[in-house]
Amino acid sequence: MPVIVIHQYLLIEFMLIFFRIIAMIVILPFIGSSAVPGWAKIGLAFFMSLIVYPLIIKTQILPHLPLPMVILSIISQVLIGIIFGFLVLIIFTGVEVAGQLISVQVGFGMISLLNPLISNQQVSLVSNLLNYLALIIFIETSAFFFVIEGIYNSFQTIPLTFINFSPYIFKYLELKAGDIFLIGINLSIPIILVAILLNIIIALMGRIAPQFNIFAVGFPIIIVVGLLMLYISVPYFTDYIMMSFSGLKLEFNRLINLTAYHG
């Protein structure tokens, strides 16, 4: 079995750092989208690796690694990076789900636009608006620095040769995936409740006054009220999204601890 000789250690350590960072970058919204060229992602990952490498080299000392272990370590670094990016993606996906739910209720369900931030697929108009709002908050607040801090702290605790993913980690990710629907419901529930109440009122009016044309009058009313509720709800959307991003630091630390103590 071939063994990596000592003069290759520096290259292998840098390579493992790079793979963890690049895997996280390609998962992150906007930065990881197809709108950003591949060379820019690779360049950013390379630059971040150059910064991280001298800071952690003293704490990450690689043993003699056979080639199969190097390959397994690369795969594990990619998985760790994907998991970190996934924690951020959960919030943006939850925001997109909220937009889809709102669009259906306010009559915009048939209007779709390309979403370059996450999936590069057609999503509803409201989903696009909320995703751009989330991106602005992500950039304007310290959320992006939470991501950088989280991936840096992971190098302090999670070894570059880490390959043991325990069931605790996957259970944690399963629970976090449920946050997509939680965020979507919490963001959209005020407008959904108003839309349901408005539909009930319009239905009662059609029942009481049969000459009342529900489709000619009711549909425009739903759209106008929906737009008004969207405008009124912007501060609520902003506060909730900011609260979700503020929890990233805690989630990164929780993931690092789970990996360190149960890995």
Residue ranges and their predicted role:
Residues M1-G263:
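Hydrophobic alpha-helical segments and their helix-loop boundaries in membrane
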